[in-house]
Amino acid sequence: MSFLGGFFGPICEIDVALNDGETRKMAEMKTEDGKVEKHYLFYDGESVSGKVNLAFKQPGKRLEHQGIRIEFVGQIELFNDKSNTHEFVNLVKELALPGELTQSRSYDFEFMQVEKPYESYIGANVRLRYFLKVTIVRRLTDLVKEYDLIVHQLATYPDVNNSIKMEVGIEDCLHIEFEYNKSKYHLKDVIVGKIYFLLVRIKIQHMELQLIKKEITGIGPSTTTETETIAKYEIMDGAPVKGESIPIRLFLAGYDPTPTMRDVNKKFSVRYFLNLVLVDEEDRRYFKQQEIILWRKAPEKLRKQRTNFHQRFESPDSQASAEQPEM
């Protein structure tokens, strides 16, 4: 199965076909402009192999070149500084020495057990992408074609997955206890919890749980944080009473979040928070944030095939405590 498209130059068309293209799974990714693209899916350590096909469009023509190569590239691009892209992986295979093409040709290539240390990602201010890049080197203008791939990082966690339990409130006015069943959730998981009202002396009109995504790019004074509310779950609409307990069930699968990503190549991070929001009758808002870890669980078939997945996230116990506005 070939990648869609190709380079429609004046002489030849460049196309890439993966050796396992007929059976390899594809994945979707939303671009920065909101469109959904579908590309072949790879995991860390998998080989990438196939053929580069050069098809002449004009028989009898010649194409002089200074060499033909294919690269496997992993790249981070900050949207506010597109001139400063960073390549964290760049593998090169030379396909042909300088010479002349007079007819269509195919070249085999293979990148063995390629390290793909990060998950593919497109956010508000940053893009992390993997792609194959074919270059026909010429004296004046090279012929170049890129083919995107998608990489998913799989993580495993120990059986210990502590619940989150906290008591928060406003002195002599409001005192609540909230509990979430875990601190780490896979992307298709269900957040289960409960809110218990210990003291209620203000009139609460509305209460909701939000899943918030924070994308942090840059370092030091140039750090930029983009905050997005991924999901909202209405806990109650109306005044609670002392002793009331309200259950929480938030299904992550319906919102398609990414995994937590920490300090990716010292360029960016993606973190997730549960934000408990209360609104009183005077429209004052009280909130409390708690960071959680989201991770990608291996498909059942893959879990049986492989016994050792790379764990890319450190324990949440080792990270700095998140900003938590006082309620």
Curated annotation (Swiss-Prot):
Membrane topology recorded in Swiss-Prot or TrEMBL: Peripheral membrane protein
Positions where Phosphoserine occurs in the chain: 315
Protein transport is among the record's keywords: yes
Localisation per UniProt entry: Cytoplasm; Endosome membrane; Early endosome
Residue ranges that the Swiss-Prot or TrEMBL entry lists as coiled coil: none
Protein keywords: Cytoplasm, Endosome, Membrane, Phosphoprotein, Protein transport, Transport
Name this polypeptide is given: Vacuolar protein sorting-associated protein 26A
Organism the protein comes from: Mus musculus
Gene responsible for this protein: Vps26a
